[in-house]
Amino acid sequence: MLDLFGNEIIERAAGSNKIFTCLAASNHSGGDRQSEDYYATEPKAVQELLAVESFSDTILEPCVGGGHIAEVLKQNGHKVIAQDIIDRGYPGTIIRDFLTQLVNYNDIISNPPYVMAREFCEHALDISPEGVKVAMFLKLTFLESQERKAFFQKYPIKYLYVFSKRMNCAKNGEFEKYHSNAVAYGWFVWHPA
């Protein structure tokens, strides 16, 4: 049996109360999470963003990781300022905690650690002047929660691009090992005024 969203459901044995369980879940279980929350972005997700949004020539990628976003940006003619709090071997990475950066004058495209996504988005918007675009690749569940309600009231998104086919985020950038796309992601785009 399937629910309205196409998820398989299980019905409890006859003679008892019916309980339905959706078998869709996040592909990141608590004990299996990467310690620094490093899940690389499928390059196709960046190509899809660039097909619908234009960005300045120079882009800041504050969570560059292995360069999966940065490489697509470079292939499309952008100069990328690559930084991360950890050196994951991507050439030219500036080792810096983005949350301590005081100012930014470049468009930002990134997939921040989900456990700190609100902090990254808020900081990006706080340090970026009018005219700078901020695009963050986030789980659609980022739209939920009381804590983020105040955030969205203060920083309303301009566009939310939701994929018709789910994108993959690979733990430690190992796409050949991790093929799950159990989580729905989207590009959250702000145009600070």
Per-range role (PLM):
Residues 1-193:
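Class I S-adenosyl-L-methionine-dependent methyltransferase catalytic core
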